Amino acid sequence: MRPLIAFGFIVLLASAGVAAPPAYLLISESELAEARRKADEHPRARQVLDDLLERAEEALGRPVELPARGGQWPHWYSCKRDGARLKTISPTEHRCPVCGTVYRGEPYDSVPLYHQHGQYSRAVRDLGLAYRLTGRAELARRAKEILLGYAARYRNYPLHDRFGEAKTGGGHVMAQTLDESVWLIPVVWGYSLVRETLSEEERRRVEEGLLRPAAGVIREHKLGIHNIQCWKNSAVGLVGFAVGDEELIREAIDDPQRGFRAQMARGVTSDGLWFEGSLGYHHYTMSALWPLAEAARLAEIDLYSDRYRALFDAPISLALPNGDSPGFNDNAGGNLSGYAPLYELAYARWGESRHGKVAAGGSRNSLEALLYGAARLPEGSVAPEASILLRDAGYAALRSPLVTAAVRFGMHGGGHGHPDKLNVVTYGAGRLAGLDPGSINYGVPLHQEWYKSTIAHNTVSVDGQIQKNEDGQLEEWRSEGGVTKFTGVADRVYDGVVLRRTLELDGAELRDRFECSSDGEHTYDWAFHAPGRISSSLALEAVAVPL
Protein backbone atom coordinates (compact mmCIF):
# COMPACT_ATOMS: atom_id res chain seq x y z
CA MET A 1 0.00 0.00 0.00
CA ARG A 2 1.30 3.44 -0.94
CA PRO A 3 2.33 5.41 2.19
CA LEU A 4 0.74 8.75 2.94
CA ILE A 5 3.41 11.30 2.08
CA ALA A 6 2.04 14.76 1.48
CA PHE A 7 -1.03 14.15 3.61
CA GLY A 8 0.32 11.97 6.33
CA PHE A 9 -1.92 11.69 9.37
CA ILE A 10 -4.07 9.06 11.02
CA VAL A 11 -7.44 9.77 12.60
CA LEU A 12 -8.76 7.41 15.26
CA LEU A 13 -12.51 7.04 15.33
CA ALA A 14 -13.64 6.75 18.88
CA SER A 15 -16.81 4.93 17.90
CA ALA A 16 -15.04 2.35 15.77
CA GLY A 17 -11.45 2.39 17.00
CA VAL A 18 -10.02 2.31 13.48
CA ALA A 19 -7.86 4.47 11.26
CA ALA A 20 -8.85 6.70 8.38
CA PRO A 21 -8.83 5.11 4.91
CA PRO A 22 -5.95 5.15 2.44
CA ALA A 23 -5.27 8.33 0.52
CA TYR A 24 -7.46 7.39 -2.43
CA LEU A 25 -10.72 7.31 -0.47
CA LEU A 26 -12.76 4.85 -2.56
CA ILE A 27 -10.02 2.64 -3.93
CA SER A 28 -6.80 1.13 -2.66
CA GLU A 29 -3.41 0.95 -4.34
CA SER A 30 -3.82 -2.79 -4.79
CA GLU A 31 -7.19 -2.29 -6.51
CA LEU A 32 -5.61 0.26 -8.86
CA ALA A 33 -2.90 -2.27 -9.69
CA GLU A 34 -5.56 -4.92 -10.35
CA ALA A 35 -7.40 -2.50 -12.66
CA ARG A 36 -4.21 -2.02 -14.67
CA ARG A 37 -3.77 -5.78 -14.90
CA LYS A 38 -7.37 -6.29 -16.07
CA ALA A 39 -6.90 -3.62 -18.73
CA ASP A 40 -3.79 -5.43 -19.98
CA GLU A 41 -5.52 -8.82 -20.17
CA HIS A 42 -9.19 -8.17 -21.00
CA PRO A 43 -10.42 -6.17 -24.01
CA ARG A 44 -13.53 -4.83 -22.24
CA ALA A 45 -11.48 -3.53 -19.33
CA ARG A 46 -9.01 -2.00 -21.79
CA GLN A 47 -11.90 -0.21 -23.50
CA VAL A 48 -13.12 1.21 -20.19
CA LEU A 49 -9.62 2.47 -19.41
CA ASP A 50 -9.27 3.94 -22.90
CA ASP A 51 -12.62 5.71 -22.50
CA LEU A 52 -11.50 7.09 -19.13
CA LEU A 53 -8.24 8.35 -20.62
CA GLU A 54 -10.12 9.89 -23.54
CA ARG A 55 -12.38 11.82 -21.16
CA ALA A 56 -9.32 12.94 -19.21
CA GLU A 57 -7.66 14.11 -22.43
CA GLU A 58 -10.78 16.07 -23.34
CA ALA A 59 -10.73 17.76 -19.93
CA LEU A 60 -7.04 18.48 -20.45
CA GLY A 61 -7.69 19.99 -23.86
CA ARG A 62 -10.40 22.41 -22.73
CA PRO A 63 -9.67 25.59 -20.79
CA VAL A 64 -11.11 25.66 -17.29
CA GLU A 65 -13.99 28.15 -17.48
CA LEU A 66 -16.19 27.52 -14.47
CA PRO A 67 -19.76 28.86 -14.70
CA ALA A 68 -20.35 32.30 -13.24
CA ARG A 69 -23.22 31.06 -11.06
CA GLY A 70 -24.86 27.91 -9.80
CA GLY A 71 -27.11 25.63 -11.80
CA GLN A 72 -30.85 25.05 -11.56
CA TRP A 73 -33.14 22.06 -11.09
CA PRO A 74 -33.09 19.91 -14.26
CA HIS A 75 -36.77 18.99 -13.87
CA TRP A 76 -37.64 22.53 -14.96
CA TYR A 77 -36.15 21.85 -18.39
CA SER A 78 -39.23 20.46 -20.12
CA CYS A 79 -42.01 21.95 -22.19
CA LYS A 80 -45.08 22.76 -20.11
CA ARG A 81 -47.35 21.87 -23.02
CA ASP A 82 -46.16 18.39 -23.96
CA GLY A 83 -43.45 17.44 -21.44
CA ALA A 84 -40.68 17.15 -24.04
CA ARG A 85 -37.15 17.89 -22.85
CA LEU A 86 -36.00 21.29 -24.07
CA LYS A 87 -33.10 21.83 -26.45
CA THR A 88 -30.52 24.51 -25.62
CA ILE A 89 -30.24 26.89 -28.57
CA SER A 90 -28.21 29.54 -26.73
CA PRO A 91 -27.57 30.51 -23.10
CA THR A 92 -30.87 32.44 -23.18
CA GLU A 93 -32.99 30.39 -25.62
CA HIS A 94 -34.43 26.95 -24.89
CA ARG A 95 -36.71 25.35 -27.48
CA CYS A 96 -39.20 22.50 -27.34
CA PRO A 97 -38.32 20.02 -30.12
CA VAL A 98 -41.98 18.96 -30.42
CA CYS A 99 -44.07 22.13 -30.52
CA GLY A 100 -41.35 24.75 -31.02
CA THR A 101 -42.20 26.82 -27.94
CA VAL A 102 -39.21 28.90 -26.82
CA TYR A 103 -38.51 29.46 -23.12
CA ARG A 104 -36.30 32.29 -21.84
CA GLY A 105 -35.12 33.55 -18.48
CA GLU A 106 -35.01 31.68 -15.20
CA PRO A 107 -35.11 28.92 -14.25
CA TYR A 108 -34.36 27.77 -17.80
CA ASP A 109 -31.19 29.80 -18.34
CA SER A 110 -29.49 28.18 -15.35
CA VAL A 111 -30.38 24.54 -16.08
CA PRO A 112 -27.55 24.12 -18.64
CA LEU A 113 -25.19 25.33 -15.90
CA TYR A 114 -26.31 22.34 -13.80
CA HIS A 115 -24.87 20.11 -16.51
CA GLN A 116 -21.70 22.18 -16.86
CA HIS A 117 -20.98 21.92 -13.13
CA GLY A 118 -21.62 18.19 -13.34
CA GLN A 119 -19.10 17.86 -16.17
CA TYR A 120 -16.43 19.59 -14.09
CA SER A 121 -17.21 17.36 -11.12
CA ARG A 122 -16.80 14.20 -13.19
CA ALA A 123 -13.70 15.66 -14.81
CA VAL A 124 -11.99 15.98 -11.42
CA ARG A 125 -12.73 12.30 -10.73
CA ASP A 126 -11.68 11.15 -14.20
CA LEU A 127 -8.49 13.19 -14.17
CA GLY A 128 -7.62 11.84 -10.74
CA LEU A 129 -8.21 8.23 -11.71
CA ALA A 130 -6.34 8.66 -14.99
CA TYR A 131 -3.43 10.18 -13.09
CA ARG A 132 -3.30 7.25 -10.67
CA LEU A 133 -3.53 4.70 -13.47
CA THR A 134 -0.93 6.34 -15.75
CA GLY A 135 1.22 8.58 -13.54
CA ARG A 136 0.91 11.51 -15.97
CA ALA A 137 1.46 14.64 -13.89
CA GLU A 138 -0.36 16.99 -16.28
CA LEU A 139 -3.62 15.20 -15.49
CA ALA A 140 -3.23 15.90 -11.79
CA ARG A 141 -2.39 19.53 -12.55
CA ARG A 142 -5.63 20.01 -14.48
CA ALA A 143 -7.66 18.42 -11.66
CA LYS A 144 -5.92 20.76 -9.24
CA GLU A 145 -6.79 23.75 -11.41
CA ILE A 146 -10.48 22.86 -11.31
CA LEU A 147 -10.40 22.23 -7.56
CA LEU A 148 -8.68 25.52 -6.82
CA GLY A 149 -11.08 27.31 -9.15
CA TYR A 150 -14.06 26.02 -7.21
CA ALA A 151 -12.32 26.73 -3.91
CA ALA A 152 -12.01 30.38 -4.93
CA ARG A 153 -15.62 30.64 -6.10
CA TYR A 154 -17.74 28.28 -4.03
CA ARG A 155 -18.81 30.60 -1.22
CA ASN A 156 -19.29 33.46 -3.68
CA TYR A 157 -21.87 31.52 -5.67
CA PRO A 158 -25.21 32.72 -4.22
CA LEU A 159 -27.14 30.22 -2.13
CA HIS A 160 -30.28 29.36 -4.11
CA ASP A 161 -33.02 26.75 -4.15
CA ARG A 162 -35.24 25.47 -6.97
CA PHE A 163 -37.25 28.68 -6.85
CA GLY A 164 -34.22 30.96 -6.81
CA GLU A 165 -34.54 31.78 -3.11
CA ALA A 166 -31.66 31.80 -0.60
CA LYS A 167 -33.10 29.15 1.70
CA THR A 168 -31.92 26.09 3.59
CA GLY A 169 -32.15 23.13 1.25
CA GLY A 170 -30.57 25.04 -1.60
CA GLY A 171 -26.94 24.96 -2.63
CA HIS A 172 -24.24 27.17 -4.05
CA VAL A 173 -23.27 25.09 -7.09
CA MET A 174 -26.66 23.42 -7.44
CA ALA A 175 -30.24 24.32 -6.53
CA GLN A 176 -30.78 21.68 -3.85
CA THR A 177 -28.62 19.81 -1.39
CA LEU A 178 -29.36 16.56 -3.22
CA ASP A 179 -27.66 17.82 -6.36
CA GLU A 180 -24.95 19.54 -4.32
CA SER A 181 -24.17 16.13 -2.79
CA VAL A 182 -24.19 14.29 -6.10
CA TRP A 183 -21.82 16.95 -7.45
CA LEU A 184 -19.53 16.87 -4.40
CA ILE A 185 -18.90 13.11 -4.27
CA PRO A 186 -16.78 12.89 -7.47
CA VAL A 187 -15.06 16.15 -6.50
CA VAL A 188 -13.85 14.88 -3.13
CA TRP A 189 -12.86 11.51 -4.62
CA GLY A 190 -10.87 13.28 -7.31
CA TYR A 191 -9.25 15.46 -4.67
CA SER A 192 -8.12 12.41 -2.74
CA LEU A 193 -6.54 10.99 -5.90
CA VAL A 194 -4.40 14.07 -6.61
CA ARG A 195 -4.01 15.46 -3.09
CA GLU A 196 -0.36 14.55 -2.71
CA THR A 197 0.46 16.71 -5.77
CA LEU A 198 -0.90 19.83 -4.04
CA SER A 199 1.15 21.97 -1.72
CA GLU A 200 0.08 22.33 1.90
CA GLU A 201 -1.34 25.77 1.14
CA GLU A 202 -3.26 24.47 -1.88
CA ARG A 203 -4.72 21.65 0.18
CA ARG A 204 -5.80 24.14 2.81
CA ARG A 205 -7.53 26.26 0.16
CA VAL A 206 -9.42 23.29 -1.28
CA GLU A 207 -10.46 21.92 2.09
CA GLU A 208 -11.37 25.22 3.74
CA GLY A 209 -12.71 26.97 0.65
CA LEU A 210 -14.62 24.11 -0.94
CA LEU A 211 -14.95 20.76 0.83
CA ARG A 212 -15.82 21.88 4.34
CA PRO A 213 -18.16 24.71 3.24
CA ALA A 214 -19.99 22.37 0.85
CA ALA A 215 -20.38 19.78 3.60
CA GLY A 216 -21.68 22.55 5.87
CA VAL A 217 -24.38 23.60 3.40
CA ILE A 218 -25.45 19.97 3.00
CA ARG A 219 -25.48 19.30 6.75
CA GLU A 220 -27.64 22.32 7.50
CA HIS A 221 -30.52 20.78 5.55
CA LYS A 222 -31.59 17.85 7.70
CA LEU A 223 -33.84 15.11 6.40
CA GLY A 224 -34.82 11.82 7.96
CA ILE A 225 -35.11 8.50 6.18
CA HIS A 226 -34.96 9.41 2.50
CA ASN A 227 -32.98 8.74 -0.65
CA ILE A 228 -31.78 12.34 -0.59
CA GLN A 229 -30.32 11.92 2.89
CA CYS A 230 -28.37 8.89 1.64
CA TRP A 231 -26.66 11.09 -0.94
CA LYS A 232 -26.03 13.73 1.71
CA ASN A 233 -24.52 11.14 4.05
CA SER A 234 -22.09 9.96 1.41
CA ALA A 235 -21.04 13.49 0.50
CA VAL A 236 -20.51 14.55 4.12
CA GLY A 237 -18.86 11.27 5.10
CA LEU A 238 -16.43 11.37 2.19
CA VAL A 239 -15.43 14.92 3.10
CA GLY A 240 -14.92 13.71 6.66
CA PHE A 241 -12.64 10.90 5.54
CA ALA A 242 -10.76 13.18 3.13
CA VAL A 243 -10.04 15.93 5.66
CA GLY A 244 -9.82 13.71 8.75
CA ASP A 245 -12.92 15.04 10.52
CA GLU A 246 -14.27 12.45 12.95
CA GLU A 247 -17.48 14.39 13.58
CA LEU A 248 -18.44 14.35 9.91
CA ILE A 249 -17.71 10.63 9.62
CA ARG A 250 -19.68 9.74 12.73
CA GLU A 251 -22.63 11.89 11.66
CA ALA A 252 -22.76 10.32 8.19
CA ILE A 253 -22.64 6.77 9.53
CA ASP A 254 -24.10 6.76 13.03
CA ASP A 255 -26.53 9.68 13.37
CA PRO A 256 -29.54 7.90 14.93
CA GLN A 257 -32.09 9.84 12.89
CA ARG A 258 -30.50 9.96 9.45
CA GLY A 259 -27.10 8.21 9.29
CA PHE A 260 -26.21 5.26 7.06
CA ARG A 261 -27.08 2.69 9.71
CA ALA A 262 -30.42 4.39 10.42
CA GLN A 263 -31.25 4.39 6.71
CA MET A 264 -30.62 0.64 6.60
CA ALA A 265 -32.64 -0.06 9.73
CA ARG A 266 -35.67 2.09 8.90
CA GLY A 267 -35.56 2.79 5.17
CA VAL A 268 -35.15 -0.77 3.93
CA THR A 269 -38.12 -3.07 4.44
CA SER A 270 -37.57 -6.58 5.77
CA ASP A 271 -38.09 -7.73 2.16
CA GLY A 272 -35.16 -5.60 0.98
CA LEU A 273 -37.14 -2.96 -0.90
CA TRP A 274 -36.48 0.74 -0.31
CA PHE A 275 -39.54 2.18 1.45
CA GLU A 276 -40.41 4.67 -1.32
CA GLY A 277 -41.64 1.73 -3.37
CA SER A 278 -40.12 2.84 -6.67
CA LEU A 279 -37.54 0.59 -8.28
CA GLY A 280 -35.99 3.68 -9.85
CA TYR A 281 -35.52 5.34 -6.47
CA HIS A 282 -34.48 2.01 -5.02
CA HIS A 283 -31.55 1.91 -7.44
CA TYR A 284 -30.94 5.64 -6.98
CA THR A 285 -30.57 5.01 -3.26
CA MET A 286 -28.18 2.13 -3.95
CA SER A 287 -26.10 4.54 -6.05
CA ALA A 288 -26.03 6.94 -3.10
CA LEU A 289 -24.96 4.36 -0.54
CA TRP A 290 -21.97 2.66 -2.09
CA PRO A 291 -19.42 5.54 -1.90
CA LEU A 292 -19.78 5.79 1.87
CA ALA A 293 -19.81 2.00 2.26
CA GLU A 294 -16.56 1.75 0.28
CA ALA A 295 -14.80 4.59 2.09
CA ALA A 296 -15.81 3.01 5.38
CA ARG A 297 -14.60 -0.42 4.23
CA LEU A 298 -11.16 1.00 3.51
CA ALA A 299 -11.24 2.47 7.03
CA GLU A 300 -12.11 -0.99 8.37
CA ILE A 301 -15.68 0.04 9.21
CA ASP A 302 -18.04 -2.64 7.96
CA LEU A 303 -21.27 -1.28 6.49
CA TYR A 304 -21.85 -4.29 4.24
CA SER A 305 -24.68 -5.65 6.37
CA ASP A 306 -27.35 -8.22 5.52
CA ARG A 307 -29.92 -5.42 5.19
CA TYR A 308 -27.66 -3.60 2.73
CA ARG A 309 -27.24 -6.80 0.73
CA ALA A 310 -31.03 -7.21 0.65
CA LEU A 311 -31.24 -3.97 -1.33
CA PHE A 312 -29.47 -5.76 -4.18
CA ASP A 313 -31.71 -8.82 -3.93
CA ALA A 314 -35.15 -7.16 -4.00
CA PRO A 315 -34.99 -5.81 -7.59
CA ILE A 316 -34.10 -9.30 -8.81
CA SER A 317 -37.08 -10.75 -6.94
CA LEU A 318 -39.52 -8.32 -8.58
CA ALA A 319 -38.07 -8.31 -12.10
CA LEU A 320 -40.29 -9.14 -15.05
CA PRO A 321 -39.12 -11.94 -17.39
CA ASN A 322 -37.26 -9.48 -19.64
CA GLY A 323 -35.46 -7.91 -16.68
CA ASP A 324 -37.61 -4.78 -16.55
CA SER A 325 -38.80 -3.46 -13.21
CA PRO A 326 -42.56 -3.13 -12.64
CA GLY A 327 -43.15 0.55 -13.27
CA PHE A 328 -44.68 1.55 -9.95
CA ASN A 329 -44.49 5.08 -8.48
CA ASP A 330 -42.16 7.86 -9.64
CA ASN A 331 -39.07 6.95 -11.65
CA ALA A 332 -40.26 3.50 -12.71
CA GLY A 333 -36.85 1.87 -12.77
CA GLY A 334 -35.87 0.48 -16.17
CA ASN A 335 -34.10 -2.80 -16.81
CA LEU A 336 -31.83 -4.66 -14.39
CA SER A 337 -29.02 -4.56 -16.95
CA GLY A 338 -28.94 -0.78 -16.59
CA TYR A 339 -27.84 -1.21 -12.97
CA ALA A 340 -25.12 -3.74 -13.73
CA PRO A 341 -22.36 -1.38 -12.46
CA LEU A 342 -23.84 -1.52 -8.96
CA TYR A 343 -23.85 -5.30 -9.10
CA GLU A 344 -20.16 -5.34 -10.10
CA LEU A 345 -19.48 -3.97 -6.64
CA ALA A 346 -22.02 -6.25 -4.96
CA TYR A 347 -20.41 -9.34 -6.48
CA ALA A 348 -16.96 -8.12 -5.45
CA ARG A 349 -18.07 -7.72 -1.83
CA TRP A 350 -20.45 -10.68 -1.29
CA GLY A 351 -19.54 -13.08 -4.09
CA GLU A 352 -23.15 -14.14 -4.66
CA SER A 353 -23.86 -15.70 -8.03
CA ARG A 354 -27.11 -13.80 -8.69
CA HIS A 355 -25.33 -10.48 -8.27
CA GLY A 356 -22.60 -11.58 -10.65
CA LYS A 357 -25.18 -12.63 -13.24
CA VAL A 358 -26.81 -9.20 -13.16
CA ALA A 359 -23.39 -7.62 -13.63
CA ALA A 360 -22.70 -9.98 -16.53
CA GLY A 361 -25.96 -8.90 -18.17
CA GLY A 362 -24.62 -5.38 -18.63
CA SER A 363 -22.04 -4.14 -21.09
CA ARG A 364 -19.25 -4.05 -18.47
CA ASN A 365 -18.21 -0.64 -19.80
CA SER A 366 -18.37 1.13 -16.43
CA LEU A 367 -15.73 2.42 -14.05
CA GLU A 368 -17.14 0.04 -11.46
CA ALA A 369 -16.36 -2.91 -13.75
CA LEU A 370 -12.79 -1.71 -14.24
CA LEU A 371 -12.06 -0.73 -10.65
CA TYR A 372 -13.99 -3.33 -8.66
CA GLY A 373 -15.36 -5.95 -11.05
CA ALA A 374 -14.22 -9.55 -11.21
CA ALA A 375 -12.21 -10.57 -14.25
CA ARG A 376 -14.84 -13.26 -14.93
CA LEU A 377 -18.47 -13.36 -13.91
CA PRO A 378 -20.98 -16.20 -13.57
CA GLU A 379 -23.29 -16.63 -16.53
CA GLY A 380 -26.96 -17.47 -16.79
CA SER A 381 -30.38 -15.94 -16.30
CA VAL A 382 -31.42 -14.29 -13.06
CA ALA A 383 -35.07 -14.03 -14.08
CA PRO A 384 -37.08 -15.42 -11.16
CA GLU A 385 -39.50 -18.25 -11.92
CA ALA A 386 -41.45 -18.60 -8.69
CA SER A 387 -44.16 -16.29 -7.41
CA ILE A 388 -43.02 -14.05 -4.60
CA LEU A 389 -44.63 -11.94 -1.89
CA LEU A 390 -42.84 -8.93 -0.40
CA ARG A 391 -45.25 -8.64 2.51
CA ASP A 392 -43.56 -5.77 4.34
CA ALA A 393 -43.04 -3.67 1.21
CA GLY A 394 -46.53 -4.40 -0.10
CA TYR A 395 -45.68 -5.95 -3.46
CA ALA A 396 -46.30 -9.33 -5.02
CA ALA A 397 -45.39 -10.99 -8.30
CA LEU A 398 -47.55 -13.88 -9.49
CA ARG A 399 -45.60 -16.02 -11.95
CA SER A 400 -46.17 -18.92 -14.30
CA PRO A 401 -44.01 -20.00 -17.25
CA LEU A 402 -46.25 -17.89 -19.50
CA VAL A 403 -47.47 -14.88 -17.50
CA THR A 404 -46.26 -12.52 -14.78
CA ALA A 405 -48.54 -10.16 -12.88
CA ALA A 406 -47.03 -7.69 -10.40
CA VAL A 407 -49.35 -5.98 -7.94
CA ARG A 408 -48.85 -3.11 -5.51
CA PHE A 409 -51.00 -3.23 -2.40
CA GLY A 410 -49.13 -1.95 0.67
CA MET A 411 -47.29 1.17 1.79
CA HIS A 412 -47.86 4.40 -0.10
CA GLY A 413 -44.20 5.32 -0.56
CA GLY A 414 -43.92 8.89 0.69
CA GLY A 415 -43.62 11.80 -1.72
CA HIS A 416 -42.75 9.54 -4.65
CA GLY A 417 -45.75 7.29 -4.13
CA HIS A 418 -48.68 7.21 -6.55
CA PRO A 419 -52.39 6.96 -5.63
CA ASP A 420 -52.75 3.49 -7.16
CA LYS A 421 -53.54 0.86 -4.54
CA LEU A 422 -54.19 -2.57 -6.08
CA ASN A 423 -52.54 -1.49 -9.33
CA VAL A 424 -51.25 -4.32 -11.53
CA VAL A 425 -48.63 -4.59 -14.26
CA THR A 426 -48.83 -7.66 -16.50
CA TYR A 427 -46.36 -9.36 -18.82
CA GLY A 428 -46.95 -12.19 -21.27
CA ALA A 429 -46.12 -13.37 -24.78
CA GLY A 430 -42.79 -11.57 -24.50
CA ARG A 431 -44.14 -8.09 -23.85
CA LEU A 432 -45.86 -5.83 -21.35
CA ALA A 433 -49.62 -6.05 -21.52
CA GLY A 434 -50.72 -3.88 -18.60
CA LEU A 435 -48.77 -0.63 -18.33
CA ASP A 436 -48.03 1.74 -15.45
CA PRO A 437 -47.50 5.38 -16.51
CA GLY A 438 -44.34 5.91 -14.46
CA SER A 439 -43.43 9.60 -14.36
CA ILE A 440 -42.01 12.50 -16.32
CA ASN A 441 -39.99 15.54 -15.27
CA TYR A 442 -41.53 16.75 -12.02
CA GLY A 443 -41.58 20.38 -13.13
CA VAL A 444 -44.12 19.59 -15.88
CA PRO A 445 -47.77 20.18 -14.82
CA LEU A 446 -48.77 16.93 -16.54
CA HIS A 447 -46.85 14.99 -13.90
CA GLN A 448 -49.41 15.89 -11.24
CA GLU A 449 -52.39 16.16 -13.58
CA TRP A 450 -52.04 12.72 -15.17
CA TYR A 451 -49.11 10.62 -14.01
CA LYS A 452 -50.08 10.94 -10.35
CA SER A 453 -53.80 10.44 -10.94
CA THR A 454 -55.56 7.18 -10.08
CA ILE A 455 -57.21 6.77 -13.49
CA ALA A 456 -53.75 6.63 -15.12
CA HIS A 457 -53.15 3.30 -13.36
CA ASN A 458 -54.59 -0.19 -13.68
CA THR A 459 -56.91 0.01 -10.71
CA VAL A 460 -60.30 1.42 -9.70
CA SER A 461 -61.05 5.09 -9.10
CA VAL A 462 -64.20 6.23 -7.32
CA ASP A 463 -66.36 9.19 -8.37
CA GLY A 464 -63.57 10.48 -10.58
CA GLN A 465 -61.45 11.25 -7.53
CA ILE A 466 -57.83 10.44 -6.74
CA GLN A 467 -57.14 7.86 -4.05
CA LYS A 468 -55.89 9.10 -0.69
CA ASN A 469 -52.25 8.46 0.14
CA GLU A 470 -53.01 5.54 2.44
CA ASP A 471 -51.62 2.03 2.77
CA GLY A 472 -53.42 -1.13 1.74
CA GLN A 473 -53.33 -4.62 3.26
CA LEU A 474 -52.80 -8.21 2.22
CA GLU A 475 -55.81 -10.45 2.78
CA GLU A 476 -54.71 -13.72 1.16
CA TRP A 477 -51.61 -15.20 -0.46
CA ARG A 478 -51.30 -18.77 -1.61
CA SER A 479 -48.88 -20.29 -4.11
CA GLU A 480 -48.93 -24.05 -4.58
CA GLY A 481 -49.40 -26.65 -7.27
CA GLY A 482 -48.59 -24.18 -10.03
CA VAL A 483 -51.42 -21.85 -9.01
CA THR A 484 -50.92 -18.52 -7.23
CA LYS A 485 -53.72 -16.56 -5.59
CA PHE A 486 -53.53 -13.04 -4.17
CA THR A 487 -56.15 -10.87 -2.48
CA GLY A 488 -55.44 -7.33 -1.35
CA VAL A 489 -57.68 -4.73 0.28
CA ALA A 490 -57.65 -0.94 0.29
CA ASP A 491 -60.26 0.36 2.72
CA ARG A 492 -58.92 3.84 3.50
CA VAL A 493 -58.21 5.32 0.07
CA TYR A 494 -61.86 6.43 -0.35
CA ASP A 495 -64.21 7.35 2.48
CA GLY A 496 -66.81 4.66 3.02
CA VAL A 497 -65.55 2.44 0.20
CA VAL A 498 -63.71 -0.87 0.41
CA LEU A 499 -61.70 -1.99 -2.62
CA ARG A 500 -60.75 -5.65 -2.84
CA ARG A 501 -58.82 -7.26 -5.69
CA THR A 502 -58.24 -10.97 -6.20
CA LEU A 503 -55.78 -12.28 -8.78
CA GLU A 504 -55.41 -15.97 -9.54
CA LEU A 505 -52.76 -17.16 -11.99
CA ASP A 506 -52.84 -20.66 -13.44
CA GLY A 507 -50.61 -21.20 -16.46
CA ALA A 508 -51.65 -18.76 -19.19
CA GLU A 509 -54.89 -17.83 -17.41
CA LEU A 510 -54.98 -14.80 -15.12
CA ARG A 511 -58.33 -14.36 -13.38
CA ASP A 512 -58.90 -10.84 -12.04
CA ARG A 513 -61.83 -10.01 -9.73
CA PHE A 514 -62.26 -6.45 -8.40
CA GLU A 515 -64.91 -5.91 -5.71
CA CYS A 516 -66.05 -2.44 -4.65
CA SER A 517 -68.37 -2.19 -1.66
CA SER A 518 -70.03 0.76 0.04
CA ASP A 519 -73.25 1.70 1.80
CA GLY A 520 -73.68 4.60 -0.62
CA GLU A 521 -73.95 5.00 -4.37
CA HIS A 522 -70.77 5.75 -6.31
CA THR A 523 -69.35 5.75 -9.81
CA TYR A 524 -66.57 3.22 -10.23
CA ASP A 525 -64.06 3.37 -13.10
CA TRP A 526 -61.93 0.29 -13.58
CA ALA A 527 -59.02 1.23 -15.84
CA PHE A 528 -56.59 -1.02 -17.67
CA HIS A 529 -53.92 0.52 -19.88
CA ALA A 530 -52.50 -1.62 -22.66
CA PRO A 531 -50.09 -0.77 -25.49
CA GLY A 532 -51.71 -0.21 -28.86
CA ARG A 533 -53.12 2.30 -31.31
CA ILE A 534 -56.61 3.74 -31.47
CA SER A 535 -58.49 3.22 -34.74
CA SER A 536 -62.02 4.39 -35.40
CA SER A 537 -64.35 4.70 -38.37
CA LEU A 538 -65.76 7.82 -36.75
CA ALA A 539 -64.32 11.29 -37.11
CA LEU A 540 -62.47 12.19 -33.92
CA GLU A 541 -62.18 15.71 -32.59
CA ALA A 542 -59.60 16.94 -30.09
CA VAL A 543 -61.25 18.35 -26.98
CA ALA A 544 -59.45 20.31 -24.26
CA VAL A 545 -60.89 19.09 -20.97
CA PRO A 546 -59.32 18.37 -17.58
CA LEU A 547 -57.90 14.89 -17.30
Which residues fall in each region the model found?
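Secondary-structure capping and boundary motifs in well-ordered enzyme cores
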Residues: 119, 176-180, 228, 256, ...
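Bacterial N-terminal signal peptides
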Residues: 6-15
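Carbohydrate-active enzyme catalytic cores, enriched for enzymes
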Residues: 232, 237-243, 280-433
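Extracellular glycan-targeting catalytic surfaces
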Residues: 18-224, 230-237, 253, 257, ...
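Catalytic and substrate-binding regions of extracellular carbohydrate-active enzymes
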Residues: 359-547
